[in-house]
Curated annotation (Swiss-Prot):
Binding residues annotated for a divalent metal cation, in chain numbering: 8, 10, 43
Marked site (Transition state stabilizer) residue numbers: 35, 133
InterPro entries linked to this entry: MECDP_synthase, MECDP_synthase_CS, MECDP_synthase_sf
PROSITE patterns documented for this protein: ISPF (PS01350)
Cofactor note: Binds 1 divalent metal cation per subunit.
Top-level taxon in the UniProt lineage: Bacteria
Pathway(s) the chain acts in: Isoprenoid biosynthesis; isopentenyl diphosphate biosynthesis via DXP pathway; isopentenyl diphosphate from 1-deoxy-D-xylulose 5-phosphate: step 4/6
Database matches in Pfam families: YgbB
Cofactor: a divalent metal cation
Name by which UniProt lists this protein: 2-C-methyl-D-erythritol 2,4-cyclodiphosphate synthase
Organism expressing this protein natively: Wigglesworthia glossinidia brevipalpis
Binding positions for 4-CDP-2-C-methyl-D-erythritol 2-phosphate per the UniProt entry: 8-10, 35-36, 57-59, 62-66, 142
């Protein structure tokens, strides 16, 4: 069994970019400042999977100064990473905590789990998504950004 941890954070920006979380478009008046689509959930999962498999981090594999990753759908990046890992491991579970004040995502969590499970070709019951507010504290609490943390357990096959 191998365990990996991932984290990602993006600030909300003035330039509107759709808010994508776990591969799902979430209606909101703000988007994130990012090179790719800025999907903090997928980015934290990618880093946790890379950590569990000792394959580095998202910034090394997909540098933010490479034009081919400009506005790329992060689900594509997740599939690329999983294709490197799936020969040796299967998903034990993935646990994600999203930190944000708004929008509320509870009505989207099942759809997010389904999207992630489709990318990873695993069952939805091994993926957990939850969100926490920052109670008005810090930049996220002031609605200036969004962050995600993920822990992945990989099992050798």
């Amino acid at each position: 069994m191998r365990v990996g941890h991932g984290f990602d954070i993006h600030k909300f920006g003035k330039i509107y970019k759709p808010l994508i979380l776990g591969g799902v478009h979430i209606p909101y008046c703000k988007g994130v400042v990012s090179h790719s689509d800025g999907d903090v959930i997928i980015h934290s999962i990618i880093d946790s999977l890379l950590g569990a498999s000792s394959l580095g981090d998202i910034g090394i594999l997909f540098p933010n100064n490479d034009i081919k990753y400009k506005n790329i759908n992060s689900c594509i990046l997740l599939q690329v990473v999983w294709n490197c890992i799936k020969k040796k491991y299967k998903i034990g579970n993935i646990d994600v905590t999203l930190f944000l004040e708004y929008p509320k995502i509870s009505s989207y969590t099942n759809k997010i789990c389904l999207c992630i499970s489709n990318c990873l070709k695993c069952k939805t019951d091994v993926i957990n998504i939850k969100s926490k507010t920052m109670e008005g504290l810090g930049e996220i609490g002031k609605k200036k950004g969004i962050a995600s943390e993920a822990v992945s357990v990989l099992l050798e096959i």
